[in-house]
Structure formats: structure tokens, C-alpha cells
């Protein structure tokens, strides 16, 4: 018999009754039923119930063990009585009558419980992450992550991609988020950077003639944490393809993503390919966001002209100054009390906006300050154009276009949730396309890149030379699922002359481009194919599939919101010897010990 186990803790069934077996695992729960001691033994695979009589040689040893001690149990598989069969447990028809127990490791008193899913302070959970990971939900999330990555790999290889690894130590880039810097011992005063993404390397691979590249890529960005973003590092399905159009990229990755979500989505509905395409301007108009959640059926309308020179002076004044008015429908909201509408207005103020106007309709009668000031005819025309019913409501966001769109988008989400309109048990994908290439920076008083400076402008050099920069669109796209951005991507600008011109419009001369992006721009001068790709976030995919609200619930050893690893004590001070080797001196001494 094996020294530790003949089976795992999820393997035994009624067919094994009468067999002598050996299991190893953690003491999950103990129950003393007056002369009978029951122990739930847990391993990676599941649970098996162990039973010992009070006159058994192993009773006292089991009774004295703390939860989470690691033991090896030898005994006979016996059938449970019908009244104590547990249909919710894979091994629920049997139990092991213990004859031998060997303690492999004693557990101290636990700082947090493993059994159950009690909500516990996050700092404790992260400090003792190895205990937290024993909990069933979190354990399943990490296994799910492993399976998702394996499925992504298989599907990409089936599409003709090869997996390659790009460098982790690279050069710092002036674009994007803050870099994590690594000092060089050999070159004092110089620094490597951890890659924010393998962007330049994967493009250089296309220049080198590798046609289809992918990797599960670690990425490092010194940026603040959010619910859907880990501080420090994250992983993405990074891929790039040569000689492709935007539609080729879409057609390649859609079946990969749809397939993974169908495989691991637990029967939830998944948007079939091809995914809907929504222009950026339409996304901002109809959904108030470039990350639209299509589970929400509500669409925003522009009603600016209804308020131009209208009787509602507040909105009329905003429109006269170049502002806009956006309407967010609220089906059947008129059946609610006025408090529903006032609460929405108060919520908007709490979010930092001036407020949210509204009209509530009860049995066909429009109420509220806006309806009174607009007048009956203008109000009825507005409601008719919006297609509202006799007990609907509508909210209004007014102001500068960007601000009004943002408020309208947030209000759309909130109304959808409050009125229970969000489609359940579904994953709704879409592409957001036709992003603007440039935008105007009010503070700097100049045109800057709107998003990705390395994407190909639609219309190429001709567009850059003849069109207003603010009218130029880019071959740039985002893939969104349930309101969460999974990836940005683009058809790349592979022509040096077009790249120089695009950067010139954004205020960079040729010397600056050559200095900051020498590796890529020089490579493009030796023959570069048209190419494009994207990089869907693995962490966010798993978060959606696991139904978790926070990305830290699907990461093995995450940092906290302050970018601290409480378990390993990072970041931490280093010795003077280490600093001297790197030719570094700390200008500001840390005032307190972090991650302690």
C-alpha cells in the first residue's frame, strides 16, 4: 500500500465498500456524536468522511487534533445508512472506518477559518493567503484559472498560432502607465523596466517573419488597484498576426473567447460570433461608455434640440453654451413614488455631478419640474420621440458632451440595476471600433494621441495630411464583455513615414520618435508586414467566469490595494550592501515598515 494514499478524497464510491484504503489530507471538520467521532478529511479533490468509535485505538488521536492538521488515515470503506447519505457530496454514500491514523503535520490555532465561506477582513486573508486558498470557493477559482489558460492555449494552437516568450527585462517607455524599474549592477545609473506588455517585441516578431504569435504574458504596471485591476502584475492572452485586416483579427479571436466562455460559463448564454460592432461615438452616445454592458436593454438618446430655446431655462442655457442633453429611459418607473426619482438625483450629486433631471409619468400625466417648465406640447413631443409609455420615467443628464455622456452612462447602469432590467446568466460580448486617433488636450492646448499612438490611422497618410486631426479615426478596437473591457487591440502602423507624421501631429518631432522608439522604428525601415492583434486579460476573463466582483479572488497571491504583499512582506527595504552594489542611495528613508 502506498505510504500516503491509495485514493484521493473524492474518489471512493459505494462500489469500493469493503476495500482497505489509505487517504491523506487536512482535517476539515470534526463532530463528536457521543461515542462516534466524525472527521471530514479534505484534499485538493474533495471530502471524505472518516468515522472512529470511542473504543477505537485512533479515537483519542483524532479527537485531540486541531482543524487543518494533516493526517494519513487507513481504514475500511463502509456504506452509510440511507438516512445519513449526503447527496451533495461525491463520496456521500460511503465513509471510512479508521483503523490507523498518522499525523503528518500539526496545525496551530487558525487566524481565519477554512471551513465555510465567512467574510473575513481582507488584510487577514492576504497575510495568510495559503489558508485562504484552502477555502472551497477560492480553491475552485484558481483551478478554474488553470483550466481556462489551458483551454486558451489549445484553442490558439488550433488556430495556427505558436507560443513564444518575450523578455521580462526591457527598456522603459515614455508612453502608458508608470514602469517598474530594475537598476542595473553592470551599468551604474541605468535601469531596466518590467514590460507593461510585450507590445514592441510582438510587433518585432512580425517584422522578423513569425506569422502568428501568442503567449500567456505577464505584464507589469505601477498603477492603482481597482475591482477589475490588480496592482503590480496581471496576465493577458497576448497575440499578433501578420498580413491581416481588422476583420481578420476579429474572426480569429471570437471563436476562442466564445468557446472558452461556453466551456466554463456554467450554461450561461454567450454571444455567438460575429460579435456586435459598435462605433466609439455610438457607444458614448447610446451607452455613455466605451465599455457598454449589453445585458442592459436601455439606450440613451440625445434630446439636445428639444431643450434649445425651451421653457426649461437651466437646460436651455447649457445648450446655448454648446452643451448637450441626454435622456435615460426608466421603463415602468412612473409606478414608483417620487422618492425613486429624488434618490436618483441625490445619487448623481454624490457621484460629483450637479444633478439629474427627470420626468415621471403616472397614468399618462407627466410630472416634475422639467415637464412643468417645458409646457404640455413640448413635453408630449419629447416623450413621444422617446417612445415612453404611460407609466414610464426618464432621466436627463446635461452639460458638456463628455461630462453628460459619463453621467448618462452611470445613470443607465444604475437604472438598469434598480429596475432589475439586467439580463441574468449571460455573457454579452461586443467590439468597440473606430476610436478617434487624436483628441484636444485643454490643459496643454494641443492635439495629442487619444489612445494607442502605434495604431494605423484610417485613410493612412492621406488622412493625416488632408483631414482635421480630430476627425481621423484609428484602426483600433476594444473587446468588451458585460461592461468590462477585456482587451484593447489595433492594426499597427507599420509604415515609418506614416508613424513620423502621426507623431508630428501630436507634437513629437522625428528626433524624439527616433530616440524614444528606436528599436521599432528602425526595424520598420527594413521591411515590415501589415500586422495587428490584441491581448484579452486572463484575470478579467476568469473573474467573469467565476462570478467574482473582485479580481483578487481569482489571483493566487495578489497584492492589496496599496500594492503590498502582506504575506511575503513586499515591498521591503534592502541592505546597504545591496544598494552599494547597484550604485544607489536612498534619498528619502521609509518612515514605517510596509507590508508588515
UniProtKB/Swiss-Prot annotation:
It is found in: Cytoplasm. GO terms for biological process: aspartyl-tRNA aminoacylation. ATP binds at residues 221-223, 485, 537-540. Its EC number is 6.1.1.23. Aspartyl-tRNA synthetase with relaxed tRNA specificity since it is able to aspartylate not only its cognate tRNA(Asp) but also tRNA(Asn). Reaction proceeds in two steps: L-aspartate is first activated by ATP to form Asp-AMP and then transferred to the acceptor end of tRNA(Asp/Asn). The keyword Cytoplasm applies. Belongs to the class-II aminoacyl-tRNA synthetase family. Type 1 subfamily. GO terms for molecular function: aspartate-tRNA ligase activity; aspartate-tRNA(Asn) ligase activity; ATP binding; nucleic acid binding. One of its GO terms (cellular component) is cytoplasm. Pfam families: GAD, tRNA-synt_2, tRNA_anti-codon. PANTHER family: ASPARTATE--TRNA LIGASE, MITOCHONDRIAL (PTHR22594:SF5), ASPARTYL/LYSYL-TRNA SYNTHETASE (PTHR22594). Homodimer. HAMAP family: Asp_tRNA_synth_type1 (MF_00044). It comes from Zymomonas mobilis subsp. mobilis (strain ATCC 31821 / ZM4 / CP4). It catalyses: tRNA(Asx) + L-aspartate + ATP = L-aspartyl-tRNA(Asx) + AMP + diphosphate. Residues 199-202 are annotated as: Aspartate. Keywords: Aminoacyl-tRNA synthetase, ATP-binding, Cytoplasm, Ligase, Nucleotide-binding, Protein biosynthesis. Its main location: cytoplasm. This is Aspartate--tRNA(Asp/Asn) ligase. NCBIfam families: aspS_bact, PRK00476.1. The keyword Cytoplasm applies. The record marks 33 as: Important for tRNA non-discrimination. L-aspartate binds at residues 175, 221, 451, 492.
Amino acid at each position: 500500500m502506498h505510504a500516503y494514499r491509495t485514493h484521493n478524497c473524492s474518489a471512493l464510491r459505494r462500489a469500493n465498500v469493503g476495500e482497505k484504503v489509505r487517504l491523506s489530507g487536512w482535517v476539515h471538520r470534526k463532530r463528536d456524536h457521543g461515542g462516534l467521532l466524525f472527521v471530514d478529511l479534505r484534499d485538493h479533490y474533495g471530502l471524505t468522511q472518516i468515522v472512529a468509535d470511542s473504543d477505537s485505538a485512533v479515537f483519542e488521536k483524532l479527537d485531540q487534533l486541531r482543524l487543518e492538521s494533516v493526517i494519513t488515515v487507513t481504514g475500511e470503506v463502509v456504506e452509510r445508512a440511507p438516512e445519513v447519505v449526503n447527496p451533495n457530496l461525491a463520496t456521500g454514500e460511503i465513509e471510512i472506518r479508521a483503523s490507523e491514523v498518522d499525523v503528518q503535520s500539526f496545525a496551530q490555532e487558525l487566524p481565519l477559518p477554512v471551513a465555510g465561506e465567512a467574510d473575513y477582513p481582507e488584510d487577514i486573508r492576504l497575510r495568510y493567503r495559503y489558508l485562504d486558498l484552502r477555502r472551497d470557493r477560492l480553491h475552485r477559482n484558481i483551478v478554474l484559472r488553470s483550466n481556462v489558460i489551458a483551454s486558451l492555449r489549445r484553442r490558439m494552437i488550433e488556430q495556427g498560432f505558436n507560443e513564444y516568450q518575450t523578455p521580462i527585462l526591457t527598456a522603459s517607455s515614455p508612453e502608458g502607465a508608470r514602469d517598474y524599474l530594475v537598476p542595473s549592477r553592470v551599468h551604474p545609473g541605468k535601469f531596466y523596466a518590467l514590460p507593461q506588455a510585450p507590445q514592441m517585441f510582438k510587433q518585432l516578431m512580425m517584422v522578423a517573419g513569425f506569422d502568428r504569435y501568442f503567449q500567456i504574458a505577464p505584464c507589469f504596471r505601477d498603477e492603482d488597484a481597482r475591482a477589475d485591476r490588480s496592482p503590480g502584475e496581471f496576465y493577458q492572452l497576448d497575440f499578433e498576426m501578420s498580413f491581416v485586416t481588422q476583420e481578420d483579427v476579429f474572426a480569429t479571436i471570437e471563436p476562442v473567447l466564445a468557446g472558452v466562455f461556453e466551456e466554463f460559463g456554467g450554461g450561461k448564454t454567450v454571444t455567438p460570433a460575429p460579435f456586435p460592432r459598435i462605433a466609439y461615438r455610438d457607444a458614448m452616445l447610446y451607452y455613455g461608455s466605451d465599455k457598454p454592458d449589453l445585458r442592459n436593454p436601455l439606450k440613451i438618446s440625445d434630446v439636445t434640440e428639444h431643450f434649445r430655446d425651451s421653457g426649461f431655462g437651466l437646460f436651455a442655457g447649457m445648450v446655448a453654451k454648446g452643451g448637450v442633453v441626454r435622456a435615460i429611459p426608466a421603463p415602468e418607473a412612473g409606478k414608483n413614488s417620487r422618492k425613486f426619482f429624488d434618490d436618483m438625483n441625490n445619487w448623481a450629486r454624490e457621484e460629483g455631478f450637479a444633478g439629474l433631471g427627470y420626468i415621471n409619468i403616472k397614468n399618462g400625466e407627466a410630472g416634475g419640474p422639467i415637464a412643468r417648465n417645458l409646457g404640455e406640447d413640448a413635453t408630449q413631443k419629447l416623450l413621444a420621440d422617446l417612445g415612453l409609455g404611460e407609466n414610464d420615467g426618464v432621466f436627463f443628464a446635461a452639460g458638456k458632451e463628455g461630462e453628460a455622456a459619463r453621467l448618462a452612462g452611470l445613470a443607465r447602469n444604475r437604472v438598469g440595476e434598480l429596475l432589475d432590467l439586467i439580463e441574468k446568466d449571460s455573457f454579452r460580448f461586443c467590439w468597440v471600433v473606430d476610436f478617434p486617433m487624436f483628441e484636444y488636450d485643454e490643459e496643454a492646448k494641443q492635439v495629442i494621441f487619444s489612445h494607442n499612438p502605434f495604431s494605423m490611422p484610417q485613410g493612412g497618410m492621406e488622412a493625416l495630411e488632408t483631414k482635421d486631426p480630430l476627425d481621423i479615426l484609428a484602426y483600433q478596437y476594444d473587446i468588451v464583455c458585460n461592461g468590462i473591457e477585456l482587451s484593447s487591440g489595433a492594426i499597427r502602423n507599420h509604415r515609418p513615414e506614416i508613424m513620423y507624421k502621426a507623431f508630428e501631429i501630436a507634437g513629437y518631432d522625428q528626433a524624439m520618435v527616433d530616440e524614444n522608439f528606436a528599436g521599432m522604428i528602425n526595424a520598420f525601415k527594413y521591411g515590415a508586414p501589415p500586422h495587428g492583434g490584441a491581448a484579452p486579460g486572463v484575470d478579467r476573463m476568469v473573474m467573469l467566469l467565476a462570478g467574482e466582483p473582485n479580481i483578487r479572488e481569482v489571483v493566487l497571491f495578489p497584492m492589496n490595494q496599496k500594492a503590498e504583499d502582506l504575506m511575503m512582506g513586499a515591498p521591503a527595504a534592502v541592505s546597504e550592501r545591496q544598494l552599494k552594489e547597484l550604485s544607489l542611495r536612498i534619498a528619502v528613508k521609509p518612515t514605517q515598515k510596509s507590508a508588515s
